[in-house]
Design a protein with these regions (language model features):
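C-terminal subregions of glycosyltransferases and related glycan-biosynthesis enzymes
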Residues: 74-75, 80-83, 87, 92-169
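A generic structural signal for ordered secondary structure
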Residues: 8, 12, 31-32, 91-93, ...
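Conserved nucleotide-sugar donor-binding catalytic segment
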Residues: 23, 31-115
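Conserved donor NDP-sugar-binding/catalytic core segment of glycosyltransferases
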Residues: 1-30
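Glycine-centered small-residue hotspots that permit tight backbone geometry or close packing
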Residues: 16, 26, 68-69, 132
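Surface-exposed charged/polar residues within alpha-helices that form helix-capping/stabilizing sites
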Residues: 6-7, 44, 127
Length: 169
């Protein structure tokens, strides 16, 4: 966390970074999840996608306590927290570098899909609407778009992630 500690001196409340995905054999897949870096770009990105890779997150715990901590949103607790922190004026920053390697592949896609994720997605979109992150119609549109993605077969979902949500390194 050396880089995050140094950057935190600039009064950022939440600091993250890009991640590099590896497969089950710890082999690099050459897939990087790149994130927006500036506070302005992160807040814009927040309206449609999770702007902080949770495993890289470095944040002020007093601010997290002030907003009531993580919401109870199955597999979306971190995204819900960033939404709450944004509403309370948190300042975000992402380091434009992959500081962590994460397990991608089928295990990632199995966790990210299925009916069990739908109620949490609804709660997340409702939170976005209630905290004025997005208008109601957009929250509903995003909810239904994500439900479709959540119900995709793993082989199609993996291609969607690889070709639409990741960058080749």
């Amino acid at each position: 966390f050396e880089k995050q500690i140094e950057i935190a001196k600039n009064n950022y409340d939440v600091i993250g970074s890009n991640i590099l995905e590896v497969d089950q054999n710890n082999e690099i897949q050459n897939l990087e999840k790149q994130m927006p870096t500036s506070n302005r770009d992160i807040k814009k990105y927040l309206k449609s996608r999770n702007p902080i890779n949770h495993m890289t997150a470095f944040y002020k715990t007093d601010l997290v306590k002030k907003v009531g901590g993580y919401p109870d949103f199955y597999h979306r607790e971190d995204y819900g927290l960033w939404i709450k922190l944004n509403y309370h004026g948190a300042i975000f920053y992402n380091i434009n570098e992959s500081l962590v390697q994460v397990n991608g592949g089928k295990s990632l896609f199995k966790r990210r899909r299925g009916f069990k994720n739908i109620p949490a997605e609804f709660k997340l979109q409702l939170l976005c609407y209630r905290l004025k992150i997005k208008p109601f119609y957009l929250a509903i549109l995003h909810f239904f778009a994500r439900v479709i993605i959540l119900l995709l077969p793993i082989n199609i979902l993996s291609k969607f992630y690889i070709y639409k949500l990741r960058k080749k390194k």
